[in-house]
């Protein structure tokens, strides 16, 4: 398994997001004025909320964009909003060593409208071959499947969050994390995701309804 992380700061929307990528080789409505402060990209078997220390955040700043166009959740990132969105990439490897970039790179885009957060992911393969699929069930073991998971730190406390993910085979994974503990996978909501597989990569598209998550009232960050 090769794992890595990268940290980005996204401006203009919502709350902190934590992304997890694991690639195995060979009750309130959110308001548009709330600031989206930080995105951390990870590929590791825990959420690692404390990884921000010592990182130059300004170096990894990207902006989310609001769209008024209809986004078709089909696993094909061809709408104008996707084509012009900032891209988070260049993951830093942390397992088995933390001495360089991950050999399998990932591209992440985030856009939103009044009701939904959209996440677009392109996961490139570093070696050819069949992608590991241990299960097609919901809430699969993410250490045994190629997958991508996003954590929404809606309370901006690096301790609590909502998780949404998919495997390369298209299975969904979602849950709630409280007080920095393990993720409770009994929490399931209706959200949309589609995965497309290609010879050298797999692509995923998420649509996460804002009504399904909560945040601190009056939060500005």
Language-model region placement:
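Bacterial Sec-dependent N-terminal signal peptides
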Residues: 5-56
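Structural preference for beta-rich elements and adjacent junctions enriched in aromatics
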Residues: 50-221
């Amino acid at each position: 398994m090769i794992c890595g992380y990268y940290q980005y700061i996204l401006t203009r929307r919502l709350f902190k997001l934590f992304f997890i990528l694991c690639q195995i080789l060979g009750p309130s409505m959110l308001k548009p004025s709330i600031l989206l402060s930080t995105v951390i990209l990870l590929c590791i078997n825990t959420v690692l909320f404390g990884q921000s220390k010592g990182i130059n955040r300004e170096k990894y700043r990207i902006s989310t964009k609001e769209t008024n166009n209809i986004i078709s959740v089909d696993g094909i990132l061809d709408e104008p909003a996707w084509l012009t969105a900032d891209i988070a990439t260049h993951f830093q490897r942390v397992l088995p060593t933390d001495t360089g970039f991950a050999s399998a790179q990932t591209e992440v885009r985030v856009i939103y409208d009044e009701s939904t957060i959209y996440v677009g992911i392109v996961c490139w393969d570093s070696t050819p071959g069949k992608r590991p699929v241990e299960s097609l069930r919901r809430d699969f073991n993410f250490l045994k499947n190629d997958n991508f998971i996003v954590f929404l730190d809606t309370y901006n406390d690096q301790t609590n969050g909502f998780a949404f993910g998919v495997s390369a085979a298209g299975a969904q994974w979602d849950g709630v994390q409280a007080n920095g503990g393990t993720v409770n996978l009994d929490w399931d909501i209706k959200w949309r995701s589609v995965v497309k597989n290609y010879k050298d990569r797999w692509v995923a598209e998420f649509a996460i309804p804002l009504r399904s998550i909560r945040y601190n009232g009056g939060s500005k960050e």
